[in-house]
């Protein structure tokens, strides 16, 4: 359950990077794990099926979905990253998204964000900890 304190931290982080807060932005602040990546991009990773479904059901035009190659048949969290993210943040987001799946940690996978494709291995989930908004 989202606590008032954790929600306040997410709002404070949001306003530091974006002064325009819309209803959809507030909805998204209530969903998923929120990360602030190295170059400042915001990443959101669904915590569970309910989060995944809610994120997909309420599109936010400030974000791009991190997608897997369909033929890889990867099951895991739904993830999004800021549309204005740097290439480095996009690659990190792709690696972190793979970390929250059952994908083999030794194999490479094709991950796409908008029109960019990355062939990468999953990152260790522990790395995500340092980017959580807290």
Language model features with spans:
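Nucleotide-activated chemistry modules centered on ATP-dependent adenylation/adenylyltransferase
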Residues: 1-87, 96-105
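Generic C-terminus detector
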Residues: 84-134
């Amino acid at each position: 359950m989202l606590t008032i304190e954790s929600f306040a931290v997410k709002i404070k982080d949001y306003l530091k990077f974006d002064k325009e807060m819309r209803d959809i932005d507030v909805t998204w602040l209530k969903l998923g794990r929120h990360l602030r990546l190295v170059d400042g991009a915001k990443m959101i990773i669904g915590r569970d099926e309910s989060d995944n479904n809610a994120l997909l059901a309420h599109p936010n035009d400030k974000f791009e979905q991190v997608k897997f190659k369909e033929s890889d048949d990867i099951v895991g969290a739904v993830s999004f990253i800021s549309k204005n993210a740097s290439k480095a943040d996009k690659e990190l987001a792709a690696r972190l998204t793979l970390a929250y799946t059952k994908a083999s940690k030794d194999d490479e996978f094709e991950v796409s964000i908008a029109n960019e494709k990355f062939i990468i291995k999953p990152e260790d989930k522990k790395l995500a900890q340092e980017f959580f908004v807290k």
